[in-house]
Amino acid sequence: MDAPRFERYSSVPLFEGLQPEEIGALLGYSEQVEVEPGTVVIQEGAEPTDFYVIAEGVLDVVLTDQVEEAKVLARLSDLSCFGEMGLVSDESHSASVIAVESSRLRKFSIARMKELLDMEDRTVYRMVLGLARLIAHRLQMSDERRVG
């Protein structure tokens, strides 16, 4: 991948504020995977091992309630990320993520990212700062929904 292709990923919340070459370095730690409609990429209740950035496609975030009925919580598309909470929490996945259409994903190993953090990789630290901003934004949105 060259710099102009990296710039496409600059709108990914985890990569906010990173330079194209830093985004390229992070993408170098990932692998591209392709999934077909109906593929369960993340299973509710499973231990987190990877997180993903959607290069192209549409996936649903689905929660199963007490009577085993699936409820779509969100629909994700190009340049959205999911599974990233596994970087900061060992909690099992709170929802499933299922492909709605054929999709291309960038798959990042959580273990590899943690190794890089242990090695004090500056770019990965900056990505985790992006994760902190994303979590803060989600909490703010959740609070606004409760109040409004």
Short names for language-model regions:
Residues 1-148:
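Cytosolic regulatory regions built on CNB/CRP/Popeye-like sensor folds
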